[in-house]
A protein has these predicted regions:
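Acidic, metal/ion-coordinating pockets
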Residues: 1-263
Length: 263
């Protein structure tokens, strides 16, 4: 199949702190060139010191070549982001959050003269943030846009792989790809489901290999041993980028290939 017939989307796992940001800033351009990327999506909810995102960080990510920023339960950790979420079309918060909260949960953009949608949804199993039922919510959005958009990517920010896999099969044949985020641990279950939807339980993270999900191992261990919640810190060395490249048919939105990447 010719390049003109496909869309290649690079979707990157949760960016952790300054180390993760620097890794993106220095490597995104070369990654896009290597894989001939048409659309770059990153989860940015941990980019500000490990918790939240600021307008300045978001703008710098866009300048670096990111097209869409997704988030999750930490999106409001930085108060400065609230107003920005209403102004910037291409930064998302989970669509199934309360309607009273700032921001929006999906966007539509043009890629190769075709409309492409990115939807951000949060799970509810094992999550403390109260959300609307993700299955009911995503179905409403997909039904609303499906007649005008064939290529749809979903960031499902959730704790439970049971819920994530169920979500993938729920959307099988309705969307191009379902990628899990939140745990910061990359899974090796990437595949194309039988009705043409690309799936992976978790993208992993853009964070340090010498860490506990991007954070200081000593502090994490101390908290577990002493049964207390401690203020943690990100680890900035040996940072890797984890994610996937999904190749899909330009006209039908059907996924053709999903490939894990780690750089």
């Amino acid at each position: 199949m010719q390049d003109n017939d496909v869309i290649r989307a690079l979707i990157i796992g949760d960016i952790i702190g300054d180390g993760g940001l620097k890794k993106i800033f220095f490597n995104l351009k070369s990654l896009k060139e290597k894989y001939n990327i048409d659309l770059a999506i990153v989860n940015g909810e941990n980019s500000s010191g490990g918790f939240g995102i600021t307008p300045e960080i978001a703008e710098n990510l866009f300048k670096a070549g990111v097209n869409v920023i997704t988030t999750g339960n930490h999106v409001y950790a930085e108060s400065s982001i609230r107003e920005y979420l209403d102004k910037q079309e291409y930064i998302l918060r989970p669509n199934n959050f309360s309607d009273l909260l700032e921001g929006h949960g999906y966007c539509i953009l043009n890629v190769k003269n075709e409309k492409v949608a990115v939807i951000n949804i949060q799970g509810f199993l094992g999550m403390t943030f109260i959300v609307k039922n993700p299955f009911e919510n995503i179905k409403k959005v997909v039904n609303m846009i499906r007649n005008k958009v064939k290529t749809i990517f979903v960031d499902f920010h959730a704790e439970s792989n049971y819920e994530k896999e169920s979500f993938g099969y729920f959307l099988n044949g309705l969307v191009t790809g379902v990628v899990g985020t939140h745990t910061h641990i990359m899974t090796q279950d990437e595949r194309i489901l039988d009705k043409g939807t690309a799936y992976i339980s978790d993208l992993g993270m853009t964070g340090s290999l010498n860490s506990v999900i991007g954070f200081n191992p000593e502090i994490s261990l101390k908290g577990l041993l002493e049964y207390v919640a401690l203020r943690t810190e990100t680890v900035e060395d040996d940072v890797i980028i984890q994610g996937v490249v999904i190749t899909s048919h330009l006209k039908t939105g059907r996924a053709l290939k999903i490939e894990r990447i780690q750089k």
